Amino acid sequence: MTLRQALGEAVRRLAAGGVERPRLEAEVLLGWACSLTRPRLLARLEEELAPAAAGRFWQAIDRRAAGYPLQYLTGHQEFMSLDFKVTPAVLIPRQDTEVVVEAVLERLDPCESYTIADCGTGSGAIALSLAHYLPRARVYATDISPAALTVAQENARKLGLAARVTLLQGDFLAPLRGLKLDALVANPPYIPTAALPGLPADVRSEPRLALDGGPDGLDAYRFLLPGAAGLLRPGGLLALEIGSDQGQAVKDLARAVGAYRNEQVLPDYAGRDRCFLAYRREE
């Protein structure tokens, strides 16, 4: 079987499994199985599919058609133009979260020194992106999962950022006690518990701890908003990813804390609520 023939059959299987972009994902998985970049793969479609690569490829195609995430199969995801290792121990970084990182970068000067924290770092995508684009920043990243921190550590080493990013095990803010931060960023779990069973199969494959936001999806914000106020310097920036219908609710929670000013909600690329921003009030 040639690579072209394998690609055609893979597209058919993925489409039958409900994959939205079967051609693109088939090309990605075939390139991964053959250790070829996509352009090189497309230039060699008349070559035969090697037996070793075929075994890896068809197993991956069948798992993807059954709803297993593409990124867990390849072990990679691009975020903020950086390549991150991902495993089933971490949430897969998404384009929506880039809105949060970009909002922080727009408000901080890359020539200045900052102390920043990322709570619930997972793969380290937010923390490491901020460290990459803010070369004088010192970043602290927390996660309760040792397995997630192992992935984040590998990404920090691969990106050459391990010297400026400190990984701390613990629940959200607990490892940050005693620090004074210029910015605190988090993508907390915000999906209501009752909505979890209705999520697509690939999303349900991700860590429940990173998804389940409690009965109304707001549990993490009730904890983070008052806690962050005690860590941020006066004028410090708080940036949180939020669910698409949670903007007003998170604003109300922040205002009830009484420690913030200039609360605002920014949309994602589809125009939905995605990022809550506020500044710590000056004393």
Curated annotation (Swiss-Prot):
Its EC number is 2.1.1.297. It comes from the Bacteria. NCBIfam families: hemK_fam, RF_mod_PrmC. This is Release factor glutamine methyltransferase. S-adenosyl-L-methionine binds at residues 120-124, 143, 172, 187. Belongs to the protein N5-glutamine methyltransferase family. PrmC subfamily. Substrate binds at residues 187-190. It comes from Moorella thermoacetica (strain ATCC 39073 / JCM 9320). InterPro entries: DNA_methylase_N6_adenine_CS (IPR002052), HemK-like (IPR004556), N5-glutamine_MTase (IPR050320), PrmC_N (IPR040758), RF_methyltr_PrmC (IPR019874), SAM-dependent_MTases_sf (IPR029063), Small_mtfrase_dom (IPR007848). Coiled coil: none annotated. GO terms for molecular function: nucleic acid binding; protein-(glutamine-N5) methyltransferase activity; protein-glutamine N-methyltransferase activity. SUPFAM superfamilies: S-adenosyl-L-methionine-dependent methyltransferases (SSF53335). Keywords: Methyltransferase, S-adenosyl-L-methionine, Transferase. Pfam families: MTS, PrmC_N. Methylates the class 1 translation termination release factors RF1/PrfA and RF2/PrfB on the glutamine residue of the universally conserved GGQ motif. One of its GO terms (biological process) is methylation. It catalyses: L-glutaminyl-[peptide chain release factor] + S-adenosyl-L-methionine = N(5)-methyl-L-glutaminyl-[peptide chain release factor] + S-adenosyl-L-homocysteine + H(+).
